[in-house]
Amino acid sequence: MSIAVETFGFFMSALGLLMLGVTLPNSYWRVSTVHGNVITTNTIFENLWYSCATDSLGVSNCWDFPSMLALSGYVQGCRALMITAILLGFLGLFLGMVGLRCTNVGNIDLSRKAKLLAIAGAFHILAGACGMVAISWYAVNITTDFFNPLYVGTKYELGSALYLGWSASLLSILGGICVFSTCCCDSKEDPATRVGLPYKPSTVVTARATSDESDVSFGKYGKNAYV
C-alpha cells in the first residue's frame, strides 16, 4: 500500500511541477478591469516579465519591463520565489525517481531509498510553499490596489495564471506530503520486507528421533527373531 501511495505522490508532485513551469511564463497574471471606466479601448495583461496590450481590433503588443531595479519589490520577490519553487521541484523529482522502491537506479538499498524519498518529499513541499507564497503575494497586491479608492492608476483583476499557480502549488504540497509520509510510516521495520534467516532444523532433535526409530526397529526385529 505504501508503494502505491509514494508512487501516487510522486506523479502528483511531477504534475504540480509541470503546472508551475506553465504558470511562470503565462501572460495572464493580472488583467485590466473595466470597473469605473466609461470607455475602454484596450485590454492590458501582465506577468512577472512583460506587459501586453490588446486593442479593439485584437492586435496585441508586448514589451518587457525596462529595468529590474525599477520594478516593485513584490514583483522581484515573486520572481525569486517562483524560480526557487521550480528548482526545488526538479531536485525533488530527481531524488524521487532514484528513491522510489519500484525503481532500481544505482542498486541502492531500501534504507537509503527511504532517506532519498524523505528529502524529495521535503523539496516538493517547499516548492509548493514557495509557489503558494508567490502567487498569494501577487494576488494580495492586485486586490489591495483594486479596492483602494485613492489609487488612480490602472486597476487589475486576478488572471487565469494565478488560479493555475494555486492549483500547482497545492498539488506539489499534497504530493510531497504523500511521499514524505510513506517514509515516516516505513521507518519501523516492515514485515513484508524483513530479511529473515534461513530455517535450520535442530540437529539434536533429529538425532534423538533417529535413535528412537532405531530402537523401535531393533525391538521389532528381536520379537520376530524369537517367534
Curated annotation (Swiss-Prot):
Residues with site note (Important for the formation of tight-junction strand-like structures): M68
Topology in the lipid bilayer: Multi-pass membrane protein
Changes after translation: Palmitoylated.
Tissue: Detected in kidney, jejunum and colon (at protein level).
Role, per record: Forms paracellular channels: polymerizes in tight junction strands with cation- and water-selective channels through the strands, conveying epithelial permeability in a process known as paracellular tight junction permeability. In intestinal epithelium, allows for sodium and water fluxes from the peritoneal side to the lumen of the intestine to regulate nutrient absorption and intestinal morphogenesis.
Quaternary organization: Can form homo- and heteropolymeric tight junction strands.
Name of the protein in question: Claudin-15
Biological source species: Rattus norvegicus (Rat)
Gene: Cldn15
